[in-house]
Structure formats: structure tokens, C-alpha cells
């Protein structure tokens, strides 16, 4: 019988903590356990400490996970909770994403200070975003806009916007909802026009491979449609060697046993893009994602990827 609390690792941002608390609540409900059986362990990551540069300049997605993963591997943590879109496609040996909570809204939210919609911004307006994908998609739709790097916590970005450092910014709608800021967006962007990052809106739980105790703990909270969709999306990313250095979008939807995936790769200026659509059985999620990545890579040609990293 478990006597020590389960140790849940997380970053310390308000959004990361909200995700850890949601994971804890679901585990408590699934197993009938009291709150004191779970300890939230907050760690600062390199990605949290460096906020003045784009992730693509300082090392990519692993900046938000390394400290948590080191403590998982050493046994100091039992599980780690992540925003799945921040996870590298290759995890450290001995670790895996073993569960995904039911996915929140995957779409991007537009927050306009001088216009309520992206297409209504005046010519030359300034839009702040740290995401290469969002920057490329903005330039694809509105090449006249001035896109600048906007990093920091959600509240920091919203404060920068209020201070007039930009006319608009974009954030994941899921994160805003988890922070109780559903009313902040002035427009929710259609994923067909403005596709999200792979795994956006999904909370992922990382654990040690072969840890039967944690597998048993996490099994009841794993949402299978989310697991299959994110598996497909991450396979697409992996086939393209995707990281924070590359403008890649893609999302899968599940209906019954069927899965449909839509993916897009862009040049950083947004002026050249290649899309892919694929459908199949959900049990083949990994294969479908990999196939979609290989298909779009072949369509784009090797020259398309030169100079990205």
C-alpha cells in the first residue's frame, strides 16, 4: 500500500501549476485518494529563466523539460506534467508520455488591441508572438504586418499588449481557458486557416518506462482519443525532425474508430507552404502521422528545409 505521497513534477508558471492541479484532481477522483497523497513539486527550467529570446535561438523545446526529466530518471519524481506541445519528439532513454488528459480546445486565440480580428488589423500593425509557426501563419495571411518576438508568461504577454508594445498577440486558447481567461480573446482562429501546433491543448504525463506502479496509477485518467490524436501529431513532427526551430502545424481529430490528420509546413516568411491530409483507423495513429510527415517532406523537396535550423 502506498504510504508516501506521489510526487508530481511541474514548472512553476500559473499555467503549468493549473495543469498539475488538474492532473492531481483527476487522479484523486479516479482512485478515491485524498489530496495529501499527492505532492506538487515545482522546478524552475532553463526555458522559464531565459525570457528575452526566442526558443529557436536558445535550444528549442527541451529547455522546458530537462530539469523535470532528470528528477524523473533519478526517482525524485514519480511523474511529470507537461504541455504536450512543449515536448521534444525524442524523449530521454527510459521515459515516455504514458497518459494524456482529455484535450482542451486546440485552437489559437487572437487578442487584438487595435482591431478585434487578425484580418482587420491596419496595414503595418505590430503582432507579437514567440512561436515560429504563428509568425509564419501570420505572414502567410497578412504579409504586410510587422511580426515581433513576444515571450514570457501569459500575464506578461497580455501586459506587454496593454502597454502598447504590440497591436495584437496570439496565444493557445486552451491555456487561456485553464487560467480562467476565456473572455480575453477577441477572435478564435479557425484551424483550417490557422492550424495549431501538434499536441496543442493536450496535457501530457511523463513517467518511467517499466514503472508498473505509475502505469496503474495513470491508466484511468488516460483519454484514449487524445492519446491517439497526439500520437499521430507527434509522429508527424518526428518525421519532419520538428522542434521550435521549424514552422510546423498539424492536428488530428478522432471520430469513432477513425482518425483524420491535417498537416502543414511553411517557410518562416509564410510565403511557401505544403499541406497534407490523411485518414485511417485510430489504431494506426503512429503510422499515419509518420506517413503524413514523409509525404509532405517528399512534396516539399530537400531544398525547402535548408536554412531552417
Curated annotation (Swiss-Prot):
Top EC class, one word: transferase
Residue spans crossing the bilayer: none
UniProt keyword Transferase, yes or no: yes
Free-text cofactor note: Binds 1 dipyrromethane group covalently.
EC code: 2.5.1.61
Family matches, as InterPro entries: HemC, Porphobilin_deaminase_cofac_BS, Porphobilin_deaminase_N, Porphobilinogen_deaminase_C, Porphobilinogen_deaminase_C_sf
Entry GO MF terms: hydroxymethylbilane synthase activity
The protein's required cofactors: dipyrromethane
UniProtKB keywords: Porphyrin biosynthesis, Transferase
GO cellular component: cytoplasm
Leftover remarks: The porphobilinogen subunits are added to the dipyrromethane group.
Known role: Tetrapolymerization of the monopyrrole PBG into the hydroxymethylbilane pre-uroporphyrinogen in several discrete steps.
Name used for this protein in its record: Porphobilinogen deaminase
Gene from which the chain derives: hemC
Amino acid at each position: 500500500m502506498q504510504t508516501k505521497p506521489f510526487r508530481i513534477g511541474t514548472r512553476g508558471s500559473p499555467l503549468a501549476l493549473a495543469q498539475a492541479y488538474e492532473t492531481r484532481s483527476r487522479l484523486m477522483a479516479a482512485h478515491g485518494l485524498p489530496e495529501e497523497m499527492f505532492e506538487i513539486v515545482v522546478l524552475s527550467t532553463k526555458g522559464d529563466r531565459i525570457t528575452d529570446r526566442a526558443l529557436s535561438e536558445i535550444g528549442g523545446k527541451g529547455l522546458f523539460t530537462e530539469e523535470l526529466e532528470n528528477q524523473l530518471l533519478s526517482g525524485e519524481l514519480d511523474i511529470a506534467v507537461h504541455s504536450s506541445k512543449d515536448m521534444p519528439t525524442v524523449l530521454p532513454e527510459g521515459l515516455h508520455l504514458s497518459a494524456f488528459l482529455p484535450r482542451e480546445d486546440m485552437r489559437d486565440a487572437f487578442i487584438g488591441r487595435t482591431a478585434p480580428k487578425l484580418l482587420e488589423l491596419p496595414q503595418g500593425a505590430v503582432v507579437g508572438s514567440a512561436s515560429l509557426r504563428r509568425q509564419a501563419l501570420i505572414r502567410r495571411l497578412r504579409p504586410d504586418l510587422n511580426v515581433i518576438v513576444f515571450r514570457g508568461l501569459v500575464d506578461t504577454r497580455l501586459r506587454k499588449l496593454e502597454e502598447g508594445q504590440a497591436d495584437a498577440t496570439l496565444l493557445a486558447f486552451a491555456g487561456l481557458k485553464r487560467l480562467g481567461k476565456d473572455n480575453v480573446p477577441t477572435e478564435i482562429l479557425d484551424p483550417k486557416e490557422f492550424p495549431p501546433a501538434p499536441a496543442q491543448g493536450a496535457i501530457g504525463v511523463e513517467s518511467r518506462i517499466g514503472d508498473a506502479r505509475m502505469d496503474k496509477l495513470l491508466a484511468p485518467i488516460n483519454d484514449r482519443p487524445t492519446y491517439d490524436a497526439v500520437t499521430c501529431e507527434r509522429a508527424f513532427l518526428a518525421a519532419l525532425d520538428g522542434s521550435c526551430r521549424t514552422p510546423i502545424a498539424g492536428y488530428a481529430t478522432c471520430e469513432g474508430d477513425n482518425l483524420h490528420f491535417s498537416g502543414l509546413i511553411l517557410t518562416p516568411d509564410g510565403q511557401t507552404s505544403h499541406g497534407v491530409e490523411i485518414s485511417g483507423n485510430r489504431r494506426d495513429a503512429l503510422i499515419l502521422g509518420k506517413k503524413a510527415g514523409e509525404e509532405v517532406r517528399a512534396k516539399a523537396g530537400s531544398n525547402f528545409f535548408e536554412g531552417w535550423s
